[in-house]
């Protein structure tokens, strides 16, 4: 009997171990329903906020254009009104940010990344109103900014607000709802749910804690925010460029060359952004009055450009279909590209509340169209369509600048509904990303966050030294 005991106990022990393993797996997949419910609440609120923000920007832009119509007979007065309307709106946005919530300036995405790393505070009670109304001022004034920055930061702050209001405890709940709000914000800004999910997983991969709980919550939040957007808008593609032809296999090497061009330009563009930040900081020196006046001058310039050369101002969504259709000459494309590079640098680097996704999409479209027009002339045997290079270029600058090729590709596909171009877009985006990484370029948002944290550390050190000096006296 003693010799039989081990042979009888071994299967029993194995069965117990299997049962215990299955029990552990099932328990691990038990997501707290409270977090999932809160994720749905966050997604709904973020979607409504994004819709309100979008409608508010459109209303302000229409009012500004209406004011210009009333002065159309007097050209000098028309230019003056164009400058002043945009300048006043921009100054309003700059003043709110500098006076009440400096962390609401710029894109806001680095702030969310810092919060996910527990290195930046989330003061939703002041960021939400300042980012919302400040962004209305700058974007409504026609500045070259995108709405995705405000909606992502607003979304993350709404996630933290819901956490505090419902008094949920734990780091996992805080981190999950913050990420859920950010993803929902991007999805609602572009009517691109899959891009919102990928944005959190790819762009915020160093900060995002990938767990069963967090990914389920992000999915739910993105679904709800997209539903809210489509209830108040439409279910079609955000940018209507029509159905473009597919790229033949023997032309794919051209898209790799286009990716190389963006891989060179992306890191250079990032350096220009950071350099312009330093230059403009030397101009205002941290003084609120100088900062607001400088912002008004930049906003007024965008207002003038919006009247004289509309393609060079605004976020760029109106420009993309026109450029993709080939309605600009090569000389005009070069002018638009150079002008928009300058205005993007001025607007974004000045600390205005607004994003850079949309301006970069427009820049990528213009450069891609120009490349496509050259390719059409050089290789007539391929029967190329310049618009396909425009679509490929849209996401390539994002890929090279913020180092998120998947997000850029899926975002453009969802916005334009040209899924047949996924292969050339992958080639262009991957080429741009690899070359940008090979040349040592730093991702834009990571570089901005590093600057913010260095400034925060310097301020804390200065306060500590001042406190020590007071104690010694």
Curated annotation (Swiss-Prot):
List the transmembrane segments: 33-69, 77-100, 124-141, 148-166, 215-232, 253-281, 288-309, 330-349, 355-376, 422-438
Which GO MF terms are attached to this record? Answer: antiporter activity; voltage-gated chloride channel activity
Per the record, where is site Mediates proton transfer from the protein to the inner aqueous phase?
203
Say if the entry is tagged with keyword Cell membrane: yes
Question: Where is this gene product found?
Answer: Cell inner membrane
Q: Where is this site: Mediates proton transfer from the outer aqueous phase to the interior of the protein?
A: 148
Topological domains annotated Periplasmic:
70-76, 233-252, 310-329, 377-386
Superkingdom, taxonomy of origin: Bacteria
Q: Return the SUPFAM superfamilies for the record.
A: Clc chloride channel
Short motif (Selectivity filter part_2): ranges: 146-150
What keywords are annotated for this sequence in UniProt?
Antiport, Cell inner membrane, Cell membrane, Chloride, Ion transport, Membrane, Transmembrane, Transmembrane helix, Transport
Membrane disposition: Multi-pass membrane protein
How is this protein annotated for GO cellular component?
plasma membrane
Q: Which reaction does it catalyse?
A: 2 chloride(in) + H(+)(out) = 2 chloride(out) + H(+)(in)
Alphabetized Pfam families for the sequence = Voltage_CLC
Q: Which residues bind chloride?
A: 107, 356-357, 445
Kindly state the positions of the motif Selectivity filter part_3 in this protein: 355-359
Q: Which residues form the signal peptide?
A: none
Under the heading InterPro entries, the entry gives:
Cl-channel_ClcA (IPR023861), Cl-channel_core (IPR014743), ClC (IPR001807)
Kindly report every residue range on the membrane side named Cytoplasmic.
Answer: 1-32, 117-123, 167-176, 202-214, 282-287, 439-473
Its main subcellular localisation, reduced to a broad class, is: membrane
Which intervals of this chain are the motif Selectivity filter part_1? 106-110
How is this protein organized at the quaternary level? Homodimer.
Q: Which family is this sequence assigned to?
A: Belongs to the chloride channel (TC 2.A.49) family. ClcA subfamily.
Q: What does this protein do?
A: Proton-coupled chloride transporter. Functions as antiport system and exchanges two chloride ions for 1 proton. Probably acts as an electrical shunt for an outwardly-directed proton pump that is linked to amino acid decarboxylation, as part of the extreme acid resistance (XAR) response.
- Protein's name according to its UniProt entry: H(+)/Cl(-) exchange transporter ClcA
- Higher taxonomy: Bacteria, Pseudomonadati, Pseudomonadota, Gammaproteobacteria, Enterobacterales
């Amino acid at each position: 009997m003693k010799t039989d005991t081990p042979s009888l106990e071994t299967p029993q022990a194995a069965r117990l171990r299997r049962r215990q393993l299955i029990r552990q797996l099932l328990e691990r997949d038990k997501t707290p329903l409270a977090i999932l419910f809160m994720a749905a609440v966050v997604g709904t609120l973020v979607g409504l906020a994004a819709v309100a923000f979008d409608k508010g920007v459109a209303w302000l832009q229409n009012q500004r254009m209406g004011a210009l119509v009333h002065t159309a007979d007097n050209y000098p007065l028309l230019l003056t009104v164009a400058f002043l309307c945009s300048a006043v709106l921009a100054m309003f946005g700059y003043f709110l940010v500098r006076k009440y919530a400096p962390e609401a300036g710029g894109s806001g995405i680095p702030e969310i990344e810092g919060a996910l790393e527990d290195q930046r505070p989330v003061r939703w009670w002041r960021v939400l109103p300042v980012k919302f109304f400040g962004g209305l001022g700058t974007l409504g004034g026609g500045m070259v900014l995108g709405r995705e920055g405000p909606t992502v930061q607003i979304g993350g702050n709404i996630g933290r607000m819901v956490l505090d209001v419902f008094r949920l405890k734990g780091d996992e709940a805080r981190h999950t709802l913050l990420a859920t709000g950010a993803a929902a914000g991007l999805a609602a800004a572009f009517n691109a749910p899959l891009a919102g999910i990928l944005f959190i997983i790819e762009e915020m991969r160093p900060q995002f804690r990938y767990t069963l709980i967090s990914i389920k919550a992000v999915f739910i939040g993105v679904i709800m925010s997209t539903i809210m957007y489509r209830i108040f808008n439409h279910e079609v593609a955000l940018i209507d460029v029509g159905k473009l032809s597919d790229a033949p296999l023997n032309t794919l090497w051209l898209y790799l060359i286009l990716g190389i061009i963006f891989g060179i330009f992306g890191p250079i563009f990032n350096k220009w952004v950071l350099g312009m930040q330093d230059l403009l900081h030397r101009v205002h020196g941290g003084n609120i009055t100088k900062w607001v006046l400088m912002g008004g001058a930049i906003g007024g310039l965008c207002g003038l450009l919006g009247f004289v050369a509309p393609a060079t101002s605004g976020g760029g969504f109106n420009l993309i279909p026109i450029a993709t259709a080939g309605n600009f000459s090569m000389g005009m494309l070069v002018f638009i590209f150079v002008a928009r590079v300058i205005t993007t640098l001025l607007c974004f680097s000045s600390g205005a509340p607004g994003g850079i996704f949309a301006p970069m999409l427009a820049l990528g479209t213009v450069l891609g169209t120009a490349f496509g027009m050259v390719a059409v002339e050089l290789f007539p045997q391929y029967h190329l369509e310049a618009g396909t290079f425009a679509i490929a270029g849209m996401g390539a600058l994002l890929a090279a600048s913020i180092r998120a090729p998947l997000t850029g590709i899926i975002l453009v596909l969802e916005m334009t509904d040209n899924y047949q171009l996924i292969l050339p877009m992958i080639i262009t985006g991957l080429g741009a990303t690899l070359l940008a990484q090979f040349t040592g370029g730093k991702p834009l948002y990571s570089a901005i966050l590093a600057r913010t944290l260095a400034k925060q550390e310097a301020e804390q050190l200065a306060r500590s030294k001042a406190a020590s000096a007071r104690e010694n006296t």
